[in-house]
């Protein structure tokens, strides 16, 4: 699945209140480190952040992990799979 098709589908499902799963490679820009592959089993995207609030807002998606009820973020280019389909 194409990266932008996956992001578009994530947004559509989130707007309809339908959870989805995905994996991504973690990256902490401040520490310049990764904690490896992160699997999120049930999530919904949150409203996009503004450039004033996050320097990489155009490349970052905020999501709610429905299993932990934590709001988190991932960098779009680091998305690896969406609902079991590999993202390229």
Regions found by a protein language model. Give the residues of each.
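Phosphate-interacting basic helix/loop segments used at nucleotide- and nucleic-acid interfaces
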Residues: 1-17
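Short, acidic/polar N-cap/turn motifs at the starts of alpha helices
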Residues: 10, 19-21, 60
């Amino acid at each position: 699945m194409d990266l932008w098709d996956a992001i578009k589908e994530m947004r559509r499902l989130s707007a309809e209140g339908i959870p989805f799963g995905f994996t991504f490679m973690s990256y902490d820009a401040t520490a310049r480190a990764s904690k490896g592959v992160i699997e999120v089993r049930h999530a919904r995207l949150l409203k996009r952040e503004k450039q004033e609030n996050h320097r990489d807002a155009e490349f970052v998606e905020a999501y709610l992990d429905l299993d932990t009820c934590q709001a988190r973020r991932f960098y779009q280019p680091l998305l690896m799979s969406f609902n079991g389909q590999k993202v390229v």
